[in-house]
Amino acid sequence: MWSDPIADMLTRIRNANVALKEQVDVPASNLKKEIAEILKREGFIKDYTYIEDGKQGIIRIHMKYKGTRRNRERVIHGIVRVSKPGRRIYVGKDNLPKVKNGLGIAILTTSKGVLTDKQAREIGVGGEVIAYIW
């Protein structure tokens, strides 16, 4: 049993990215699906698919790279887990973080659902900062 399933998901994505893997499998949950949807929408991954396995299911994340198959360049340059089970990090609507001066995104859980920092700024809500991705 993991103590932090979100950190496990982000670590699997980070490791697959470093190893230049085509895809990575992650145990599914609703929060992980929403995070994968944000990563797809923001262009950090190609796509993801939900695979029913009779238990909780699996999310298969299809990684995205620039360039040819021989000379690949990573789209994801860094992933950092911010709010952890031992230390939750919350921000108000006035203190929403900008990752790498706007080149990256912060993923937040808010009362309006899982959002990027840009979406939260537009709506005017704060929340718990899950991760930074650039």
From Swiss-Prot:
Gene3D superfamilies: 3.30.1370.30, 3.30.1490.10. Signal peptide: none annotated. Transmembrane segments: none annotated. GO terms for molecular function: rRNA binding; structural constituent of ribosome. Keywords: Ribonucleoprotein, Ribosomal protein, RNA-binding, rRNA-binding. GO terms for biological process: translation. GO terms for cellular component: ribonucleoprotein complex; ribosome. InterPro entries: Ribosomal_uS8 (IPR000630), Ribosomal_uS8_CS (IPR047863), Ribosomal_uS8_sf (IPR035987). PROSITE patterns: RIBOSOMAL_S8. Pfam families: Ribosomal_S8. Belongs to the universal ribosomal protein uS8 family. Part of the 30S ribosomal subunit. Contacts proteins S5 and S12. HAMAP family: Ribosomal_uS8_B (MF_01302_B). One of the primary rRNA binding proteins, it binds directly to 16S rRNA central domain where it helps coordinate assembly of the platform of the 30S subunit. NCBIfam families: PRK00136.1 (NF001109). This is Small ribosomal subunit protein uS8. The gene is rpsH.
